C-alpha cells in the first residue's frame, strides 16, 4: 500500500508530511528544507519555477511571478505568466506537483494519495478548487481537512492530553482561523470556528511597505513593478527583524530608491491598528458560538508563521487575559497534523483509535420570500454554522404562488438575514406541474460531508421527481474527463528540473542582489554570477563546493544590503568573511576564491 501524504497548502509556504516510524515526519524539499514558498514563476522559455527560486524572481521578474494566490481559490481571477493565463487552483496545482516530486524523491516510491488542509473559513467553491488542484497535480485527494483541526490533531498526538479545552489561533500568511477544540480520551471535537479569509501576515507586509513609501514622500503609482517587488520583500524582512528586536532598519536599494529608515514595534501597532481590530473579531465570535468564557479555556495554541510575531502574541495575551500561550512549531504544526490524519487513514495502530469530529464553519440555506419586503429575499437556514460533520438536514418548502410551473432554488452561505449580504453558491431550476401551492411541497435536503463540500437533493413528492447537485463554481467546474485532460496538460509543462533547482535559486538570488547594489559591489556580484554560470555550464567536479561558496557569499551580501552597512572593499573581496567549522573547509573556500580570480583575469581586463 502506497503512503498517504499530508499537505499544508499555505498562502506563503507549503509543506508535506508522512506517517513514518510511528510518528508524523516532515518531508524535505530539494534544499533539505521543509518550507517550500507558495510562489510560481515562468521564464522567457516557458520553464516553470516553484518555490525558493520563484520567490527570488518576485523582485526581478514581478510580472512573470505569482504569489498569495491561495486567497483567491475558487474564483475566476487570472494570473498571466509567460504565454498563458493561470487560475489560482492551477497555480496551486503546480505547488502540489512540486510537493509530490519531493515526496517521491524522499520516500523512493510513487505516491498518489493526499490529505490537503484548507482554512476552516474556506467556502465550498474554494474547497472544491483545492480538491481540483490536487487532482490536476496527480493526487487522489483522500480528504480535505480544516487547518485548525489538523493543528489540534498534532497537539493531541504530541502532548497526549487526557482532557482539555483548547483555543487554536491559526494565523498564516493569508488567512486567520480561530477554533475551540474539546479533547477527551482519544476524541478531538471541534466546538466552534470563526475566521477571516483575507487576513494574514501578508497584510503586515503591505502596511509596512505603505508606511515606508509614505515616509519617503513617494507615490506608489509611480514606482515600477520591480521596485514595488523589492519594497515588499524588504518589508517582509523588516517584519521578521522585528520578531527579534524592538526596532529594525528597513533598507531599500534599487534604481528608483536608495533609502533606509528605522521602524519600531510601536510604529507597527499604530499603523496596523486595523489589522489587530480584525484579529479580535473571530476571537469574540468563537467564544460566543462555543458558549464559553476566556477563563474556561485550558490551553491556547498558536499556529501559523505569523504567530511568531511578538506583537501578535502580546495582543492575544491581552485579549485572552493570560500569558501561558503556546507556540508548537507554528510553521510546521498543520503539516504534522495532516501527517497524523494520513496515519489514521492508513489505519496505523498507533493512531487508529483517534477520532476527529469537525464542524461546518458557515450557515447554509436558500432564499425565500420576504412578505415585509418582496424585493429583499430572506435567508432560510437549513444547516447552521458549527453543526458537526458529516451533517444532513431536510426542510419542506412550498411554491411562492398557486399554479406556479417553475421554482428557482437559490443556495446561499452566510449568517445574514438577507441573502444579498450572503455568498451565492448556486441555483437549481425545478419544473413543477401547476397546482395549488399547498399541494406542491418541495423537500430540500442539504448534506455537508467531512471534506466540507455541500450536496443538495430536491424531491417533489407529487411527481416523484428528484434532483441533485454538488455545489461548485459553474464557471470553473470540471468533469472527470476535463480534470484528466488538465492533468495531461500539466504533465507537459516544463518544470525546472530538481537537479538544477539549487543552481537556479543561486542565480535568481544573485540577480536580485545585483539589482539592489551599486558600484564595485554590484560588479563583484555580477562577476561571481558569471563564474558560477561557467561552472554550471561545464558541470565541473567543483560545482557542489562552488554552490556552497556562493550560498555563503550571497548570504553575507544580503546581510550587508539589509543592514545598510558601508563596508570597505576588502571586507567583501578577500574571502575572509567566509567562516567554516574546519580548516579543510576554509582551505576549500580559498581554493575556490583563487579559481574565481584566475577565471576573472582571463575574462575581464583591468579597464572594465
Tell me the role of every PLM-derived stretch.
Residues 1-75, 79-85, 94, 101-608:
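Oxyanion-binding/catalytic loops of NTP- or PPi-dependent enzymes
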